[in-house]
Swiss-Prot record:
It comes from Haemophilus ducreyi (strain 35000HP / ATCC 700724). One of its GO terms (molecular function) is ATP binding. It is found in: Cytoplasm. This is Tyrosine--tRNA ligase. Homodimer. ATP binds at K230. Gene3D superfamilies: HUPs (3.40.50.620), RNA-binding S4 domain (3.10.290.10), Tyrosyl-Transfer RNA Synthetase (1.10.240.10). A motif ('KMSKS' region) lies at residues 227-231. SMART domains: S4. Its EC number is 6.1.1.1. Catalyzes the attachment of tyrosine to tRNA(Tyr) in a two-step reaction: tyrosine is first activated by ATP to form Tyr-AMP and then transferred to the acceptor end of tRNA(Tyr).
């Protein structure tokens, strides 16, 4: 039995921040044809983390509803550099960097999307053909005043920080992608709102029906404060080992867990609502977090590896009598392990930290560490000294 437009819309709105506009989306859905859904990414790094997958999951949802899914790799725009959310000019990448990163992107992408039903395109195919005349026509669609309405540009202009001309051009190039593809819908994070709306306006100028712009929240990272980012060290890469992924998911706060369920889980909303009710009724949130960790690991590895990671976690943590409650600390920037142990109150001095490690009394996530003279690793881990001293520490 076919779903009603209302039911489909309710499903598509899950986890969404804004739709520009919902009326346009309803009208397109009523056309009863496969819509052309666009998601673009500049491959600025070789690996995808869970934060990137929020919009990819939404793309998968459209794919499962029978729509035409286009994943656009910005091999041209990646060499320009997206200024979205940046306080300084992003350094451009070489074409070799972009193409190398694009290959690993595709491999990781198809852990979520059906490769046989996904069209992968490169925007150099049409942007290289623009030429000088085409670029001048494109830039004539927008004014500097309109560009300065954008928050990140406005802040930099107000603070007398430089804005390069090519950064003004970037949103126009991304918008032109939508014209070239005749996109019906474009997906992006909330930091992409301006760029997506430029696409709508350029399509109107090209006498196309404007795309619907759907924005999704940025996933909060392991620290529970800032968006997931490699530079902040609060991320989980989709290629990380199952045991590492499991431990990191289990380290997030109980409050953050529900946001992750909403943005990362494929479970029906009714099931998530029931899990929340179970926790409110007294169920240990750790057990619900285990379900989330296993779901994520199954997606990027396998169900068997998820089961092994769970057992590994139980053996290292629960059987090792690591408590659920412990002091939590957060340090910014580089910090030596010995200093970290001292600042977290696990030892009285750095010399005691060194001595305890040499005697086998220091553990990080259950693993013995015999040398604490190195710097602490970025991320959130459980640090233990002796049998009874524990602290959950985030270094970012």
């Amino acid at each position: 039995m076919a779903q009603s437009i209302e039911a489909i819309l309710a499903e598509l709105k899950r986890g969404v921040e804004n739709i520009y506009s919902e009326e346009d989306l309803i009208a397109k859905l009523k056309e009863n044809r496969p819509l052309r859904i666009k998601l673009g990414a500049d491959p600025t790094a070789p690996d995808i983390h869970l934060g990137h997958t929020v919009v990819i999951n939404k793309l998968r949802q459209f794919q499962q509803l029978g729509h035409e899914v286009i994943f656009l790799i910005g091999d041209f725009t990646g060499m320009v550099g997206d200024p979205s959310g940046k306080n300084t000019t992003r350094p451009p990448l070489t074409r070799e960097d972009v193409l190398r990163n694009a290959e690993t992107y595709k491999q990781q992408l198809f852990k979520i999307l059906d490769p046989n039903k996904t069209r992968v395109v490169f925007n150099s195919a049409w942007l290289n053909e623009l030429g000088t005349e085409g670029m001048i026509r494109l830039t004539s669609n927008y004014t500097v005043a309109r560009m300065l309405e954008r928050d990140d540009f406005k802040k930099r202009f107000t603070n007398n920080q430089p804005i390069a001309i090519h950064e003004f051009i970037y949103p126009l190039l991304q918008g032109y992608d939508s014209v070239a593809l005749q996109a019906d819908v474009e997906l992006g994070g909330t930091d992409q709102t301006f760029n997506l709306l430029v696409g709508r306006e350029l399509q109107k100028s090209a006498e196309q029906k404007p795309q619907v712009a759907i924005t999704l929240p940025l996933l909060v990272g392991l620290d529970g404060e800032k968006k997931m980012s490699k530079s902040l060290g609060n991320y989980i890469g989709v290629t990380e080992a199952p045991n590492e992924m499991f431990g990191k998911v289990m380290s997030i706060s109980d409050e953050l867990m529900w946001d992750w369920y909403n943005l990362l889980s494929f479970r029906p909303l009714a099931e998530i609502t029931q899990l929340k009710a179970d926790v409110d009724a007294g169920k240990n949130p750790r057990d619900v977090k285990i379900l989330l960790a296993k779901e994520i690991i199954t997606r990027f590895h396998s169900e068997a590896e998820a089961d092994l990671a769970e057992q590994h976690f139980i053996n290292r943590f629960q059987k090792g009598a690591i408590p659920d409650e412990m002091p939590e600390f957060c340090f910014n920037g580089e910090i030596g392990l010995a200093t970290l142990l001292k600042e977290a109150g696990l030892v009285a001095s750095t010399s005691e930290a060194i001595r305890s490690a040499q005697q086998g009394g220091v553990k990080i996530d259950g693993q013995k560490i015999d040398d604490v003279r190195a710097n602490a690793q970025l991320g959130t881990f459980v640090y233990q000294v002796g049998k009874r001293k524990f602290a959950r520490v985030t270094v970012k």
